[in-house]
Design a protein with these regions (language model features):
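Short helix-terminus and kink motifs of transmembrane alpha helices
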Residues: 14-22, 61, 65, 69, ...
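Hydrophobic alpha-helical transmembrane segments of ABC transporter permease domains
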Residues: 98-149, 234
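Helix-loop-helix
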Residues: 129-156, 219-287
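Alpha-helical segments in transporter systems
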Residues: 1-19, 38-49, 60-65, 105-125, ...
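An intracellular "coupling" helix at the cytosolic face of ABC transporter transmembrane type-1 domains
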Residues: 103, 175-185, 189-237, 279-282, ...
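Primarily ABC-family ATPase nucleotide-binding module
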Residues: 97-98, 294-298
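Transmembrane-helix motif of ABC transporter permease domains
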Residues: 1-12, 31-72, 141-164, 251-267
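Short cytosolic helices in intracellular loops of multi-pass membrane proteins
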Residues: 71-88, 167-208, 267-274, 283-293
Length: 298
């Protein structure tokens, strides 16, 4: 059901892309006969496309949330009896069952559904972008499917740079969860009996949390600087490629809007790993903790 909903919403974006082309062609020549009537017709068409899209996306989010919680429930029901029946001492076991299972289920659902959307977007928009690659005024782009290949190369290059810039993030996220768990454990003991709290020890644990968080902030700052730069360049990039064709009369304003939208969709799908790198980093650290928990319960 979720995959079907994603497929339908992707097809709605395909219809919207075609709408962009015709609508902006109309705006390019507003003085044509019957222009105002056509404008209102386009507004009605937009509503016919956009409102079902919004409803379907809302339904998709609702069903995905239920799916993620049922996955969390299955993990919890699997781990609790095994934890109860073992004498193994596992650091932060309660956190791994309560928090890590919740975050693992949410992130897996979030990333998995996003990956399905990216694949379906590629299947839908690659033919459109390929067809729109004709009429290029830039000499080195005058070959079949040029815009598709540009989108692919820029996405692969961006992903490679993102991997290099964010290479230390998974380890730092894992260490962050460990230091937070150690601090939480001492605070829980103190909540039950204040006399059991050793203030210097708790403050030392907090300083460990502080040190790791500051390292994490620094590395995320590098990554976000690169990620934001890449995102902004990709917004303007298709217009840099197609602008000369517009001003030489090879294409219309509607076509350049279609290209900008289709290029963005394809590049975003190819750049899925870049856009979701922080979520993937978090998921990897959670997976590592749950894998350790699995081995301890074996």
């Amino acid at each position: 059901v979720l995959v079907a909903l994603v497929f339908i919403t992707v097809q709605q974006t395909v219809k919207l892309n075609a709408w962009y082309g015709e609508f902006y062609d109309l705006l390019q020549k507003p003085e044509q006969a019957g222009g105002l009537e056509k404008f209102w017709d386009f507004m009605a068409q937009f509503a016919w496309i956009a409102f079902p899209f919004m409803l379907l996306r809302s339904l998709e989010t609702y069903l995905a949330s239920h799916f993620a919680f049922r996955w969390r429930q299955a993990l919890t029901e699997e781990y609790l009896p095994r934890w109860q029946g073992t004498d193994a001492i596992v650091e932060g076991a309660s956190q791994r069952i309560q928090e890590d299972c919740m975050r693992f289920a949410r992130q897996t659902e979030n990333l998995g559904l996003g990956l399905v959307r990216a694949v379906l977007t590629l299947l839908s928009f690659i033919p459109i972008l390929w067809a729109l690659s004709t009429g290029m005024a830039i000499a080195w782009l005058q070959f079949e499917g040029s815009l598709f290949w540009v989108a692919l190369v820029t996405a692969l290059g961006g992903t490679a740079i993102s991997w290099f810039v964010g290479i230390r993030l998974p380890g730092l996220e894992y260490n962050n969860q460990r230091t937070e768990a150690a601090l939480r454990k001492d605070l829980v003991y103190a909540e039950d009996d204040r006399s059991r709290m050793d203030l210097p020890t708790v403050l030392e644990l907090f300083m460990g949390v502080r040190l790791n968080n500051f390292r994490l902030f620094n590395h995320y700052a590098y990554f976000h600087l690169w990620s934001n730069f890449y995102s902004q360049v990709m917004v303007i990039f298709p217009y840099l490629l197609m602008g000369p064709s517009l001003f030489t009369g090879l294409i219309t304003l509607g076509v350049i809007q279609q290209v900008g939208n289709a290029f963005g969709k394809v590049n975003d799908a190819f750049s899925y790993l870049i856009d979701r790198w922080t979520d993937i980093t978090e998921l990897r650290s959670i997976y590592k903790r749950l894998s350790e928990f699995e081995r301890a319960l074996a």
